[in-house]
């Protein structure tokens, strides 16, 4: 065993997985996990914990894995995380916990994410559940949204003894975990549904098909329904577009809609209740994880897929692992390329996308070099479907129906970073509804912070 290198993790063969929706990464078995855990040197001042947005005791759980104590490892993790099987799969560990790992200075960091996944999966298979509160405190909290922020906040509050009800607008709980991330990265029945069951086992109730702002307002929850506090974790589901000619053509989707139709509605299957055509040649505009998810989904539906991104590969915001998997599967990357027009036929259907070549200039406000058009470099990519993956912003329904709840110029709810408190008394918020589109783990961290803020508020009320 070379302690400087990670224990390899098994994956589906790229040629095989490109034709199915089964999970790509197969994870560690017990022997592999214990071998990888033995690489951890159990630092006294563990920087990996500081790199984790929910502050999991990483050396603590890894030590238990090394000793074969899966249940003990799970209880250590579940003290900090309500969704370990999710985080072990989709967190950007390379820039967080693993990015801080001391092992990474002279070799490869410990595979913290893969070990977390192993523990969560093993606990699920053994029927191990997180430990809940011994007794309730008699206070009620409403949580809006059942995505990662809402589930985390609800789980933490339930552990503190609160009676918690989650209100979800869709017919299935899970938020972006269900509609946004494809099965190839995050299985829905085997993983997401079980994680939600674990949160419910803590005493959390979930009501679906409740659109807060229409079905019921926040003021009504506080004044008429008897809730002592409200947490808003409704995410950011309003897609952004470029504003170029042709965006209204048939065959143009936001990534949000495309993935929801595929993941939640199965609309690209012929026997679906809401079937729609899926393209043979698809362009996905954008370079984040959502763009990779949309591209890899389109590939599995039989399309030739192009990722169209205006910067170079170094600036791609997607995880290195996701880019690597996409390339392995045969997705074409048109880098330093920017769309200027979506072309359509006489019936209004997409039949191409006109692009222009770019070069990188001086850094912009994000710190990345600004892309500049190369004059006279326009060309057309032959496609019949265009998926726009340019980010999302919060839906204004909640903010527009709640008196005293202030938003910023980006339409995001204003909340204090250290406690989640909004401008309306008794109302807290976190996740994408506050920050705009970000990662699952950052939303979880915000939900955890807000739970502490709510507990402090109600304890002193």
Regions found by a protein language model. Name each.
Residues 248-279, 363-437:
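FAD-site-proximal beta/loop scaffold in flavoenzymes
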Residues 17-36, 57-89, 106-134, 262-263:
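Ferredoxin-type iron-sulfur electron-transfer modules in oxidoreductases and energy-metabolism complexes
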Residues 72, 135-136, 140-144, 196-244, ...:
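Feature captures the FAD/FMN-dependent oxidoreductase FAD-binding
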Residues 433-460:
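A conserved FAD-binding loop/helix module that cradles the flavin
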Residues 140-165, 291-299:
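N-terminal Rossmann-like FAD-binding beta1-loop-alpha1 element of flavoenzymes
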Residues 42-67, 86-119, 165, 172, ...:
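Iron-sulfur cluster-binding cysteine motifs and their immediate structural context
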Residues 119-135, 192-214, 239-301, 408-418, ...:
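Glycine-rich dinucleotide-binding loop and its adjacent helix/turn
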Residues 163-166, 170-201, 206-207, 295-341:
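Rossmann-like dinucleotide-binding cores of NAD(P)H-dependent redox enzymes
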């Amino acid at each position: 065993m070379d302690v400087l290198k990670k224990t390899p993790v098994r994956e589906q063969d790229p040629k095989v997985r490109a034709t199915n929706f089964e999970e790509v990464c197969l994870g560690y078995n017990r022997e592999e996990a214990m071998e990888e855990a033995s690489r951890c040197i159990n630092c006294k001042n563990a920087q990996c914990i500081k790199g984790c947005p929910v502050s999991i005791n990483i050396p603590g759980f890894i030590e238990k894995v090394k000793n074969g104590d899966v249940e003990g490892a799970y209880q250590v993790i579940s003290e900090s995380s309500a969704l370990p099987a999710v985080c072990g799969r989709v967190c950007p560990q390379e820039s967080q916990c693993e990015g801080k790992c001391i092992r990474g200075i002279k070799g490869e960091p410990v595979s913290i994410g893969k070990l977390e996944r192993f523990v969560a999966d093993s606990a699920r298979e053994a029927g191990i559940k997180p430990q809940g509160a011994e007794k309730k405190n008699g206070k009620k909290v409403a949580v809006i949204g059942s995505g990662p922020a809402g589930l985390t906040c609800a789980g933490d509050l339930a552990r503190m003894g609160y009676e918690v009800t989650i209100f979800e607008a869709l017919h299935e709980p899970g938020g972006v975990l269900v509609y946004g991330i494809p099965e190839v990265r995050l299985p829905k029945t085997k993983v997401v549904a079980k994680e939600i069951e674990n949160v419910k086992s803590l005493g959390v109730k979930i009501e679906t098909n409740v659109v807060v702002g229409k079905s019921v307002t926040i003021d009504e929850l506080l004044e008429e329904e008897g809730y002592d506090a409200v947490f808003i974790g409704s995410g950011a589901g309003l897609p952004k577009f470029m504003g170029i000619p042709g965006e209204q053509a048939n065959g143009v989707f936001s990534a949000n809609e495309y993935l929801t139709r595929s993941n939640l509605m199965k609309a690209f299957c012929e026997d679906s209740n809401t079937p729609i055509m899926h393209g043979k040649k698809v362009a996905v505009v954008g370079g984040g994880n959502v763009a990779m998810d949309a591209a890899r989904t389109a590939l599995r539906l039989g399309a030739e897929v192009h990722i169209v991104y205006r910067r170079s590969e170094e600036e791609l915001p997607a995880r290195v692992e996701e880019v690597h998997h996409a390339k392995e599967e045969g997705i074409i990357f048109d880098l330093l390329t920017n769309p200027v027009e979506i072309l359509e036929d006489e019936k209004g259907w997409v039949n191409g996308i006109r692009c222009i070549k770019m070069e990188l200039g001086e850094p912009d406000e994000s710190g990345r070099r600004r892309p500049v058009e190369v004059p006279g470099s326009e060309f057309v990519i032959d496609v019949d479907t265009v998926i726009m993956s340019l980010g999302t912003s919060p839906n204004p329904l909640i903010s527009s129906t709640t008196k005293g709840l202030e938003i910023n110029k980006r339409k995001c709810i204003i909340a204090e970073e250290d406690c989640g408190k909004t401008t309306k008394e008794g109302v807290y918020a976190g996740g994408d509804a506050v920050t705009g589109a970000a990662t699952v783990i950052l939303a979880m961290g915000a939900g955890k912070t807000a739970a502490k803020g709510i507990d402090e508020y109600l304890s002193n009320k």
